[in-house]
Amino acid sequence: MYFELKENKPHGTKDDPFSTYHIKNEGRSFQIPVHWHDELEIIYVKSGFLTVSISGENYIGTPGDAFVVSPGNLHFMGSQTDTVDYFTFLFPLKYISFCINDMLDDKLLEPLKNGHLMISPRVKDTAKELCEQLVEIYMAKNKKTEPQITAQIKTKIILLQFILPHFKNKL
């Protein structure tokens, strides 16, 4: 059953494996079906209320809340209220790897990828600020006001900043 729930939709491209999805739902309730994927996902609630379920734990996201879905974790999201505006950021962990089998890979990225380590789903503190920066990069990419390589460099720096506090706290 678990393998049947794998999301097979490709995320990103070879040149830019980081994906941003902006979901603005108005006027009706909805639910994204339960699924899992190999990428790490950050869910950021911009406005409204979002029900998020990660590995059987249920949360109610309010404006400014962020959630992390580790690779392989079953999750779904939805809303019973009329309006919610949220973003999801998906990326393979190798996107922020320096591809040299260093301590970052050995102690954090590989264990996350293999399911031996998980980031706590509910994220606090600086998450809102970092997610807002990711939203700004997404908007600039859509408007083509920033070179693609610049957007990728900024995105990777922000993602590393996002993960750093969790690594400091031994996840």
Language-model segments: residues:
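An amphipathic alpha-helical interaction segment
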Residues: R122-L171
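Histidine-centered metal-chelating micro-motifs
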Residues: T51, F67, P71-M77, Y95-I96
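Residue-level detector of short, conserved catalytic/binding motifs and their immediate flanks
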Residues: L40, F87, L160
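Short acidic-glycine-tyrosine-enriched beta hairpin
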Residues: G56-P71
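Generic protein-terminus/edge-of-domain signal
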Residues: M1-I60, D106, L117
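A hydrophobic/aromatic-rich effector-binding and dimerization subdomain
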Residues: Y2-S19, F76-A140
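A structure-centric signal for secondary-structure junctions around beta-strands
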Residues: D15-P17, E39, P63, T83-D85, ...
